[in-house]
Amino acid sequence: RVFRISLIRAFPALLFYPIQQVKQVMLGANGVAAHMQPGSTFIDMTSLNPIASKEIAAELASHGIQMLDAPVSGGEPKAIDGTLSFMVGGEEEVFNTFKPVLLAMGSSAVRCGSIGAGNTTKLANQIIVAANIQAVAEALTLAQKAGVDPDLVFQAIKGGLAGSTVMNAKAPMMIEGNDKPGFKVDLHIKDLNNALDCAHTVGAPVPMTAEVQEILQWLHSNGKGQADHSAIAQYYEHLTGIKLGRDL
């Protein structure tokens, strides 16, 4: 969503567009930047490759427009109840000015560094979430193949070191066979593509990210692109011929 041009000339513009559209929307011939006054601030809440964030910020700066990259974590449930977590990149003074705007939509907003740092942090977040989901799916598959109820395994370990917010949210969905989307497979593919691109650019090894990305791509190819990313468990079900929690 973008506020009407008439409303953003002297105040922040907040953008939620998909990655491929951001540059055109912001920097095109009749883009938002052409209608923003110098001294305005653009807050980008999409999940971009941080390199793209830096390119956009540099172009906006040539028009006298400041920028924050401020992707979020928490998914649809936290967006609905206003408890999103913002990870922000940009100048500290600009961040401090607009932190109250972000906290009107979320429960936390942390400045992680200069432009691009917000999206770098978001990519790190998405790597951890994807790897965690894969680990939960793999572990529960092992348990059931070994003859142990995966729900009891979940109940036993969720309070220990292996427990996590991701496990608490996704293990019950896997066990129930519920893939109603909170965060879709296709969106996670997009984020991990950005993570892989960024990693290759900066020279960071990300073999685990590449592996889980292939699983997500398999789900997409098998008609599950709009399913919740907990559908990673269905990849393991396909390989083993079981249904978690239902073939005991």
Language model features: what each stretch is:
Residues 81-89, 103, 110, 114-146, ...:
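Active-site-proximal catalytic alpha-helix in oxidoreductases
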Residues 115, 119, 163-230, 236, ...:
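Interdomain hinge/lid region at the active-site interface
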Residues 103, 244-248:
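ATP-dependent carboxylate/acyl-activation modules
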Residues 151-158, 210-214:
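Beta-strand segments within the central parallel beta-sheet cores of soluble alpha/beta enzyme folds
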Residues 48-126:
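Rossmann-fold dinucleotide-binding core
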Residues 3-67:
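Rossmann-fold NAD(P) dinucleotide-binding segment
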